[in-house]
Structure formats: C-alpha cells, structure tokens
Amino acid sequence: FNADAFPRLGSRELRDARPTAPLEIHLAGFSQTVLPGDEDNLVSHIFQDTESLLALHRFCWWPHCVGEDTASWVNVIFDSWVRRFGDDRDGWAWHPYTVAERLINLIKFAKVHGLPGEKVETLTFLSHHGAAIFSHLEYFGENNTGNHLANNGRGLFLGGLELGLDQWADVGGRILIEEGRRIFTSNGLLREGSSHYHLLVTRWYAECWLTA
C-alpha cells in the first residue's frame, strides 16, 4: 500500500485541528453533549445499547453533526478512537460489518473535510480495514448468510476505488455481483422480505454503481 497514492481523497489533512465549541452527538438511541477535551470520555463510555456503541465505531454519526467545528470534532474523536481501539481487533470495533461502515464513512468525511490526523498514518490505518474484512468475510453457508456479506463487498469495493487498491475493488465487486444474484429475487425484491432492509441494501448497490 502506497500512502502517497490516493487519487480521490484530495490532499488536505486536519492534523492538529481542535474544536472550541460543544458537540451534540447522536448515536442510535443515545445523545450527548460533548465538551472540548472530553473526547476520551466519549470513546471509553460504557453504552447500555450495543447499537449505540456500534454507531460510535462506525463514524456514521458525523454527517448528522452541525456547526463549524464538525471537522475538528471528528479529528479529535478519531485520534482518541484509534488510541483506544486501533489495535483491539477482537471486539465489536473490528467486526467486519462495522469495519466496512467505518471505512466508507471516514472516506466520505475525508472527501468533504480532509483526512483526520496525519495523512500517511491515517491512510495506513484505513488500509488495515481491508485485511480485517478479507479475513472475516461473513459467509456462513447458503442458508445462514444474510446481507452482511454484500456489505463486506461494498466496503472492499468502495475502499478499493477510493484508496487506489485494485485487488480490494476487484474482490468487492465480485462479492457484490454474486451476492446480488443470491439475496435479490428475479423481480428485484430482497429475499429477506423486509422493506427496511430492501431499501438499505438497494442503497448500497446504488452507491457502488454511482461511485464506479
């Protein structure tokens, strides 16, 4: 992986940007006002609901933040998160579905605001996400594999395109194609029969198509 070759992320990096105003953060059933300097407490918070914890790990909360300090807040929370969970590969933080979501959300953030942290370190960190997905693909046989495998493919495909890693994109694309045949019926409906998941998974495929 060459951290100097990232064709679609731009060159801006946030490095030492620090927030000066409070953050209102919303995490799947959990909301809190975070004061500048309290990011470590947020990252180490013991959540009652696992979905709130997963939302933190996935960085899916950042698009819903408002205010001029959003980028600075993501910068310091990212730094705190990496120090706390970057090497803790056995917990929820590195579950493959969550890894794919975090990779995609951080890439989206970088395209809007710049890379959190220092460029080479952050890109190297992002490159570790591919191996975490590859080594834990969520395939559990024809009858026990849900839609998570398609999301694994989405993470590899979009991450590969944005980071210039062709192998990721190739494998991710193949997973998406094969899973599309398996999880959708011939008339385009998700076999699970859930309208919620149908919209979610359809959005995944549309996102990959538009990015390609």
Regions found by a protein language model. Give the residues of each.
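Extreme N-terminal leader/anchor segments
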Residues: 1-37
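Short, well-ordered helical secondary-structure segments
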Residues: 10-14, 41-48
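Short alpha-helical hairpin
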Residues: 26-43, 55, 74-80
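Aromatic-lined, polymer-binding surfaces characteristic
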Residues: 47-212
